[in-house]
C-alpha cells in the first residue's frame, strides 16, 4: 500500500515551491477515506504561490497530526539517474529510486498507509488523525507550514501532538528521534575604509586588516560547551569579498558573511549583541566604519523527553517494534518543526537521511515497512 502511494507521489515533479498535483493527489485520497479536507494557496506572486492542505478524520481529542512536505529539491542532471527520470518510480534490488523518496514522500506514503489502515481497523477510535502538507519546505518556507498552522488554528482546529516526517535516522530506522533543532542566523559585515594607491598607504585606510582581525577572533571564539541535548554552537565564515581586481589599489571596503548554528543557550538577539561588540572594538582601533546586517530563519528549540509523555511513548513504540533504543537528537539543519513547536509538542521521525537530496535518491523497501510499522503502532498506542 505504501509503495503504491510512493509511486504516485514520486511521479509529481513537485520542485519547490510547486505542488505539481502532489498535494491535490493526497487531498483526493483523504477525501475518499472520509477526511474533511481544505486546500489553501498562500503567496502573492506567481512564483511564490504555495499549495497547502489540512485534512482531519474525527473531531475528538487527542488530534495526532502528520506534518510533511511534497516539494523536493531540483533533481540535477537527469542523465545521472539510473533510469534517466528522477520523477518516475524505479524499483531495483529492494530499493525505490526517485527524487523525494527519502525527503520526504516516503514518510508521507507510510503515514498515509498507516493512518488509513488504522481507521479501517478501528472505526470507533476516540480521537482525531490529521495531515498538514505543504509544497514549500525546501525553499523559503514562508507561505507553507507556518501560514497553514496559523490558518487552521484560526479555524478552531487544535493539534495535540505532531509527527514531522523528516528523514532523521542515521544508520538504521529507529536509531534517531529529533526532539529539537539548532537555531540559525546569517550575518553580513561590511567594513568601510578609504581607497588609495598601495604605494601611498598613509593616504588610504585599508579595511582588510580590520576585517581579518575580526574574523580571526570570531572563528576562534568558544560560544559554549553544548548542553544535554545540543552540541556546542558553531560559527562558520561563508564568504569574503573585496570586489577589487586591481592589484595596486587598496580597496574602499571589504565584506564577509558568516553563519552561526546555535543551541538553546543563545538567541539571535544575544548573539547579535556579542558579534557587534567585537566588531565595534576593532573598528574603533582601526578607525574604520562598518555596517552589520543579520537575518535568522529559526531560533533554537528543544523538548525534554523526560517531561513529555507522548515523546516517551513514541520512543517506546520504536523500541518495542524495531528492538532498537532511539537517540534523542537536535542535530542537522532547520525544518518545519520550528513552526510546529509553537502550537504543540512533536517528534521528527522518518527514513534514513543519507540519500536525501542526492542523485539516485532511494529508500529500501524494508525501511518503508519499518517506518510504516512504527507509525501504525504509535496510532495503536495513542488511541
Swiss-Prot record:
- Enzyme class (EC, first level): hydrolase
- Known HAMAP family for this protein? DapE
Which cofactors are required for activity?
Zn(2+); Co(2+)
Question: What pathway, per the record?
Answer: Amino-acid biosynthesis; L-lysine biosynthesis via DAP pathway; LL-2,6-diaminopimelate from (S)-tetrahydrodipicolinate (succinylase route): step 3/3
| Alphabetized UniProt keyword annotations | Amino-acid biosynthesis, Cobalt, Diaminopimelate biosynthesis, Hydrolase, Lysine biosynthesis, Metal-binding, Zinc
Binding sites annotated in the UniProt record for Zn(2+) 1: 69, 103, 166
Any idea which GO molecular function terms this record carries? acetylornithine deacetylase activity; cobalt ion binding; succinyl-diaminopimelate desuccinylase activity; zinc ion binding
Give me the comment on cofactor binding.
Binds 2 Zn(2+) or Co(2+) ions per subunit.
Q: What is this protein's function?
A: Catalyzes the hydrolysis of N-succinyl-L,L-diaminopimelic acid (SDAP), forming succinate and LL-2,6-diaminopimelate (DAP), an intermediate involved in the bacterial biosynthesis of lysine and meso-diaminopimelic acid, an essential component of bacterial cell walls.
Q: Which family does it belong to?
A: Belongs to the peptidase M20A family. DapE subfamily.
- List the active-site residues: 71, 137 (proton acceptor)
Which reaction does this chain catalyze?
N-succinyl-(2S,6S)-2,6-diaminopimelate + H2O = (2S,6S)-2,6-diaminopimelate + succinate
Which EC numbers does the record give?
3.5.1.18
Residues that hold Zn(2+) 2 according to the record? 103, 138, 357
Q: How does it assemble?
A: Homodimer.
Q: According to the entry, what is the taxonomic lineage of the organism?
A: Bacteria, Pseudomonadati, Pseudomonadota, Alphaproteobacteria, Rickettsiales
Can you say what this protein is called?
Answer: Succinyl-diaminopimelate desuccinylase
